């Protein structure tokens, strides 16, 4: 399969814009250039698509360093300045003219993992890596994920859903309902964001109102969810009709929980591969990972996140990431590396799975 042109889609309109650039840098560094011709496509925060020199300049940025030394707002301004007066690099969506044969989206969060970019690529008949439109949109929504998981016999944490209009019209009543149902600690989460953006761990009911306000600012649907005491583990799943699951990896958060800063800025979390669980639990996690992958109709790749509850040993699904991080500290490529599938081979397999996948 020589000289296949792969469009690397990165950036995007979500709050995970910078993380997408970091993932794209890793893919660019590890893709086999003797087999694939890389065509970078940078999507700015305002939705403009850039190719050529502009896309390559963004890809060359040390985003990790910028995020550590500056605020996200300052980094955003620098990215915006790089796209000013660069109309000659605007992409006109003529994929065929550019010779693009397959797309490799590393667009995390909204507009990337929710089925939107997948739908656009299907309109243009461009094969793409990862899950299809339906499974992407389902796994993006934490409530839908839980509903499908329960139907498949997979355990989930106790939760309730709060819709933004209901909360804004009935703040006191909804807060009282939450207080009666959940005892601290528990979580307040936007239903459709990733990388722990907007998540708050509630230790006291005094923190509830601010957490709900912030989550409602970010999403129209909010989850209130019981905090599970136990190990936080992840399983990498790869494949289409016959997926394989890695051994589980374990996250030991540096702070109260595995938040955005822990994941991408200070890297204070400790990762254990394999997870510190017995052989039986490890095998069950792999089985549950594949079961969840199939229950949500996933294809190509997904990272399945679980808790192993302290005391009971119950395996509880947390969430599914249809486009997991590909950064140097991301669990998905590290788990695949442990399974004997290096980064370059992983990219190759994902492209091959994209080309063989039957259209939805």
Curated annotation (Swiss-Prot):
Its cofactor is Mg(2+); Mn(2+). Its EC number is 6.3.2.4. Keywords: ATP-binding, Cell shape, Cell wall biogenesis/degradation, Cytoplasm, Ligase, Magnesium, Manganese, Metal-binding, Nucleotide-binding, Peptidoglycan synthesis. Pathway: Cell wall biogenesis; peptidoglycan biosynthesis. The keyword GTP-binding does not apply. It is found in: Cytoplasm. GO terms for biological process: cell wall organization; peptidoglycan biosynthetic process; regulation of cell shape. It catalyses: 2 D-alanine + ATP = D-alanyl-D-alanine + ADP + phosphate + H(+). Mg(2+) 1 binds at residues 305, 319. Binds 2 magnesium or manganese ions per subunit. Mg(2+) 2 binds at residues 319, 321. Cell wall formation. This is D-alanine--D-alanine ligase. It comes from Chlorobium phaeobacteroides (strain BS1).
